[in-house]
Curated annotation (Swiss-Prot):
One Gene Ontology biological process: mismatch repair
Signal sequence region: none
SUPFAM superfamilies xrefs: DNA repair protein MutS, domain I, DNA repair protein MutS, domain II, DNA repair protein MutS, domain III, P-loop containing nucleoside triphosphate hydrolases
HAMAP family found in the cross-reference section: MutS
SMART domains: MUTSac (SM00534), MUTSd (SM00533)
An example Gene Ontology molecular-function term: ATP binding
Described purpose of this protein according to its UniProt entry: This protein is involved in the repair of mismatches in DNA. It is possible that it carries out the mismatch recognition step. This protein has a weak ATPase activity.
Name of the protein described by the UniProt record: DNA mismatch repair protein MutS
Superkingdom of origin organism: Bacteria
InterPro entries to which the protein is assigned, alphabetical: DNA_mismatch_repair_MutS (IPR005748), DNA_mismatch_repair_MutS-lik_N (IPR007695), DNA_mismatch_repair_MutS/MSH (IPR017261), DNA_mismatch_repair_MutS_C (IPR000432), DNA_mismatch_repair_MutS_clamp (IPR007861), DNA_mismatch_repair_MutS_core (IPR007696), DNA_mismatch_repair_MutS_N (IPR016151), DNA_mismatch_repair_MutS_sf (IPR036187)
Gene for this chain: mutS
């Protein structure tokens, strides 16, 4: 954390914070930890940490730190047995925050205590470390709130190792058995509270050879997806990583290189798991195959190595459980429309260019899906539009059917609205992490599949066919879950109340015996009321004291002789009887056996669900596609979209097109539609677009790119009519800023982006350029702009012949239309009314000869004196007069 950066604190519940700290009991009683009585004031406020608290600092100055601020400073043999074990585990996981279960809390010590107390705003306290050690730093969190706190640590990029208790009762004179049961890292979390619901949480691993050929494995452990890439060139690798925005990237034995995007969470790994033999062995074991030909990986050695190393990392982070992964799927370069990072950023696909916000992005504007899995599916479609015309038409057919059949669309969306995230629920079940409430939510979702199948039985669109077939195995699973689990199970899995009566004979027998004991307790209460002549006597239970008889202080002096005083409170006295204490042991033993039996039954049921994780995920992905399609249909039906016609060749013809984001953001005026026609018949390949500043040229460029992209998603688009041929790539260069990190000026950034376009565009590409050459001297800029435009318009081999729109203030470029038959001039028109400039935002044929820059400056609020002086200088320039006088 940089100095001055604010740290985000979690706001603890008052009940949690109040019970989090208590005095340390004597050593001979429990292993519980000492907790101070005071609470930190304002625990939920954001505070700026002091400079010395910079967690990323390499400063070794220990001034102001506790004596034992690092576990490596102590002699393990001088520590208490519990802390000695903690230090042994910490030495094995030095880069991870170690949370060590002690009773109802997870504790951390030494440097981890200092870190968590600062990041999570926990009170830093201490624990006795040994006679020669004294007190060592300690901080703790309640075990039932661990997910909340761990989520914050993971969000900040820290890995967390959880050391849990492996037994409930220790042998006499021994510590409870504890060990690492889970490692939480940004790329391996499964818990719902640690994941963004509507986007994948990618874990990636890269293997690079000496010839810059690379293999990339990408897994989402929460959904089971495993994607493999193998290609050439680190530039393409960088683009792939920028697109993925992986939560964590595994690098085997190499440091971060220039191709590694800034801000990516990197985890260094040993080379061995990524070597060919180890990786192949891991893949065969995970997927139960004797050779890798069956997985289609025989000819992709680097992808295999990356996948094998990733699987080894997952196995190490999930001891005792196996995260269910689907068989690997190879992804090839020509599978989807290519969108480089700059194009994604310029078109604002998932975040706005100015401030990185979701609201205002294209995904924000078009996402009408109801489920988390539908939202993830739509995001994937947006990030990887199709190149297969058949697949695109299939999605179009489904949307058309749902648009035209409004009752069907509304019924489908009503069924989908409450559906849980079946894809991730299946993953948690397979990994043994699902709760009882997760299984109930899963049952509810599976019960909706037959209802969806019935609604879609007459549908003819291919994407809807996957849900038309009955799934008897999943229907039986839903029935099993409903039969065994109560409708509203508790959060805890260890305190009973999960399983219906009639499911298990042994459990029913234990419950019947407990009912008998409850009847006996009711009889005791009735009998003791009579014996004490106190009708207000209550028989109660406390976790620490067991069963007791409670009477008011006023009645406490007249109790029977066989009562034994146990506790005195301000308003009541508590007593026990020999008979009650003798029976208490039997009751508690029965409860423990009953709870354990329920837990065992639940785990068995969860394992049964996990065995069908693949089938559940298949159904979930079909539901996700339906949800995404139904959402796009709702958008099309309510926003006046049209179905674009897919054509062969290079046609891009859109009548009355609108920008889907801008038209939703406009509140006081209607969006002005505009048309475009490129790449076929007598239509140009290159449009030179001129017009005033702030008139809408950049919006028009983005609109054309967005509508091409939406069409290749299979979506309808905001237009009156459209005929669109498939593009292999979309390139945009709209605006540029200095790249301070690499020392590049605005002009150099602009030229680098332009060079990338000219090197990779083809006749089938769509190229959208704004203001090429503006960052240098006027004549240099004009010359560059002319040459670039001419190269785009010229057919191969002399140029690219790409469909292009070139927005510029160099009005000299209008002359290109006179020398190139496939170039046309268009302008964004304005009107001058009473010396005022009125922007019409309408694109019309013909080239502009003025940019109205001074009028735009006036509208932007430039002082009148400066505007007037600018007009004077313009007159001098246009009149050929010297500027200085």
């Amino acid at each position: 954390m940089a100095p001055g950066e604010q740290q985000l604190s979690l706001v603890p519940d008052d009940t949690i914070q109040g019970s989090l700290f208590a005095p340390e009991p004597s050593e001979d009683k429990t292993e519980e930890s000492e907790r101070p009585k005071q609470r930190r004031s304002h625990p939920g406020r954001r505070t700026a940490p002091a400079a010395q608290h910079n967690e990323d600092s390499s400063n070794n100055d220990d001034e102001g730190l506790p004596r034992w601020h690092h576990h490596g400073l102590v002699d393990p043999l001088a520590l208490t047995p519990m802390l000695r074990h903690y230090v042994e585990l910490k030495a094995a996981h030095p880069e991870r925050v170690l949370l060590y279960r002690l009773g109802d809390f997870f504790e951390c010590f030494f440097e981890d205590a200092l870190l968590t107390s600062r990041l999570l705003e926990l009170t830093l306290t201490g624990k006795e470390g040994g006679k020669s050690i004294g007190r060592v730093p300690m901080a703790g969190i309640p075990h039932h709130a661990a997910e909340r706190y761990c989520s914050e640590l993971v969000r900040r990029g820290h890995a967390v190792a959880l050391c849990d208790q492996l037994e409930t009762t220790a042998a006499k004179g021994a510590l409870l058995k504890r060990d690492i049961t889970r490692v939480l890292t940004p790329g391996t979390v499964l818990e719902e509270g640690m994941l963004a619901a509507r986007r994948n949480n990618w874990l990636a691993a890269v293997v690079l050879d000496d010839e810059q050929r690379w293999g990339l494995a990408v897994a989402d452990v929460s959904t089971g997806e495993l994607l493999l890439h193998e290609r050439q060139g680190t530039t393409e690798l960088q683009q792939q990583l920028l697109q993925l925005e992986a939560a964590e990237l595994l690098l085997p034995g190499i440091e971060a290189a220039e191709w590694c995007p800034d801000g990516l969470g990197l985890t260094q790994q040993p080379r061995t798991p990524f070597e060919a033999a180890s990786a192949d062995r891991a893949l065969k074991q995970r997927f139960g195959v004797r050779n890798l030909e069956g997985l289609g990986l025989a000819d992709h050695p680097l992808a295999r190595r990356a996948a094998g190393g990733l699987i080894a990392y997952l196995d190490a982070s999930q001891p005792g459980s196996t995260v269910p992964l689907e068989r690997p799927q190879l992804v090839f370069a020509g599978d989807a429309l290519v969108l480089d990072h700059q194009t994604r950023r310029n078109l604002e696909l998932t975040a706005t260019q100015r401030d990185g916000q979701f609201q205002g992005s294209l995904l924000w504007a078009i996402d009408r899906s109801h489920t988390a899995m539908g939202g993830r599916a739509l995001r994937r479609w947006l990030e990887a539009p199709l190149l297969d015309a058949t697949a695109i038409r299939g999605r179009q057919e489904a949307i058309t059917e749902l648009v035209e059949q409004r009752p069907l669309r509304l019924s489908v969306r009503r069924l989908l609205r409450p559906m849980a995230d079946l894809e991730r629920l299946a993953g948690r079940c397979g990994a043994g992490r699902a709760s009882a409430r997760d299984l109930v939510a899963l049952a509810d979702g599976l019960e909706r599949l037959p209802l969806l199948a019935d609604l879609l039985k007459s549908s003819s669109a291919a994407p809807l066919a996957d849900l038309q077939q009955p799934r008897p195995d999943l229907q039986q699973l839903a029935e099993l879950l409903r039969f065994q689990l109560v409708d509203q199970p508790p959060m805890s899995l260890s305190e009973g109340g999960l399983i219906h009566d009639g499911v298990d004979e042994d459990l029913d027998d234990l419950r019947n015996r407990l009912d008998e004991q409850e009847n006996w307790l009711a009889g005791v209460e009735k009998r003791e009321r009579k014996a004490s002549s106190n009708p207000n006597l209550r028989l109660q239970f406390h976790r620490s004291f067991g069963y007791f008889l409670a009477v008011s202080r006023a009645k406490a002096t007249a109790v029977p002789d066989h009562w034994i005083r146990r506790q005195t409170l301000s308003n009541e006295e508590r007593f026990v009887t020999p008979e009650l204490k003798e029976r208490e042991g039997r009751i508690l033993q029965l409860k423990a056996r009953s709870h354990q039996r329920e837990y065992d039954l639940f785990c068995r049921l969860r394992d049964q669900v996990g065995e069908q994780a693949t089938a559940i995920r298949d159904a979930a992905r079909a539901v996700a596609s339906l949800d995404a399609l139904a959402g796009l249909a709702e958008l099309a039906a309510t926003q006046g979209y049209c179905r674009p016609e897919l054509t062969d060749g290079r046609c891009l013809e859109i009548e009355g097109g609108r920008h889907p984001v801008v038209e939703q953001l406009l509140s006081e005026s209607a969006f002005v539609p505009n048309s475009v026609a490129l790449g076929h018949g007598d239509k140009p390949d290159l449009v030179v677009l001129t017009g005033p500043n702030a008139s809408g040229k950049s919006c028009y460029l983005r609109q054309c790119g967005v509508l091409q992209l939406m069409a290749q998603m299979g979506s309808w688009i905001p237009a009156e009519r459209a005929a669109i041929a498939l593009a292999d790539r979309i390139f945009t260069r709209v605006g540029a800023v200095d790249d301070l990190a690499s020392g590049q000026s605005t002009f150099m950034v602009e030229m680098a982006e332009t060079a990338n376009i000219l090197q990779h565009a083809s006749e089938r590409s769509l190229v959208l350029l704004d203001e090429i050459g503006r960052g240098t001297a006027t004549f240099d800029g004009l010359s560059i702009a002319w040459a670039v435009a001419e190269h785009l318009a010229s057919a191969p081999p002399h140029g690219l012949g790409a469909r292009s729109i070139f927005a510029t203030h160099y009005h000299e470029l209008n002359a290109l239309a006179g020398s190139h038959s496939n170039v046309a001039n268009f302008q964004v028109v304005v009107e001058e009314q009473d010396a005022e400039l009125v922007f019409l935002h309408k694109v019309m044929p013909g080239g502009a000869d003025r940019s109205y820059g001074i009028e735009a400056a006036r509208l932007a609020g430039v002082p009148p004196s400066v505007v007037q002086r600018a007009r004077q200088m313009l007159e001098r320039i246009e009149g050929g007069q010297p500027l200085a006088c």
